[in-house]
Amino acid sequence: WWEKKLNHNSKYADALRLDHVLGFFRIWSIPKDNIQGVLGYFQPAIALNENDFLQRNIYFDEKRFCKPYITESLLHDLFLDEAGYVKEKFFIQNVYGLFDFKNEFDTQKKLQEFILQEKNEVQHQKILSKLLYLHSEIILLKDAENGFHFRVNMQQTFSFHSLDEQVKNQLNHLYHEYFFSRQNELWRNNG
């Protein structure tokens, strides 16, 4: 059964890390385009869907929840004097005044590959960790089956703090249910 489990998870991740025996049963899967663990989710898992949000009176805006939420002030706070260069090199401004990664940098993996190719550019090496961080400025991850999973510690993101209090409270309740009720039932039944 464990070989089957590992083979199945190879569809979603290049590598799996098992910290302890519980990790063998509750596998944390990081999609191939991501590098950081906060952009992973349990496999198997009971994903969220749009109705889970609507039932809690949360307007489901997939782009707002699943794409990095990057404002001009966040870029200036992170990059200080280099903010202008970073905006021009890595981002495009969208119709809402927010910043989206350019297509060639729209995943952590693409960003890392670019920086590794630019070995002589000290400036790029210095900003890599901040750019990777910006990729994690999300509330939800979308899986290959169009289900949604909360980003770990979403409450610590600028994206979350930018929401109104009612939405934050509702998301917190759903987050707690997702991690501590919904998944436990699945693992209890399939453990």
Protein language model regions, located:
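Catalytic cores of glycan-processing enzymes that make or break glycosidic bonds
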Residues: 1-191
